[in-house]
Amino acid sequence: MIQTLSKLKVADNSGAKEVRVIRNLGGSVRKFTGIGDIIVCSVQSATPGGAVKKGQVVKAVIVRTTRELKREDGTYIRFSENAVVIIKEDKSPRGTRIFGPIAREIKEAGFAKIASLAPEVL
């Protein structure tokens, strides 16, 4: 479960390495978010010369969580880390590469471009 002030890894090459959650979008009293949800983040650490700078406020979509996600067929999927992909206003990824696997629920949530860039969709 991702909540306000959680620190997450960035799974793309936008220049950010780690972000901190400022706001969970999708409701005024929403406390937790999961895979496929959009969040507002502050960049905590970034690589020099990247498109995203430290301290910048960005939107991101959650692609991996350590909390298990139950699928409709009864199976569960869980990842070893919490990770996000930074997105633009039109929900397209800011970077050109995605690192690590992502859940197929990302594609079902309307992020087909992120799913096509990922090396593995579980």
Curated annotation (Swiss-Prot):
Record's signal peptide: none
GO molecular function: large ribosomal subunit rRNA binding; structural constituent of ribosome
Gene Ontology biological process terms from the UniProt entry: translation
Chain's role: Binds to 23S rRNA. Forms part of two intersubunit bridges in the 70S ribosome.
Self-association state and partner proteins as the record states: Part of the 50S ribosomal subunit. Forms a cluster with proteins L3 and L19. In the 70S ribosome, L14 and L19 interact and together make contacts with the 16S rRNA in bridges B5 and B8.
Organism: Mesoplasma florum (strain ATCC 33453 / NBRC 100688 / NCTC 11704 / L1)
Keywords assigned: Ribonucleoprotein, Ribosomal protein, RNA-binding, rRNA-binding
NCBIfam families: rplN_bact (TIGR01067)
InterPro entries: Ribosomal_uL14, Ribosomal_uL14_bac-type, Ribosomal_uL14_CS, Ribosomal_uL14_sf
Cellular component annotations (GO), alphabetically ordered: cytosolic large ribosomal subunit
HAMAP family referenced in this protein's UniProt entry, alphabetically: Ribosomal_uL14
Pfam families per record: Ribosomal_L14
Name of the protein in question: Large ribosomal subunit protein uL14
Family label: Belongs to the universal ribosomal protein uL14 family.
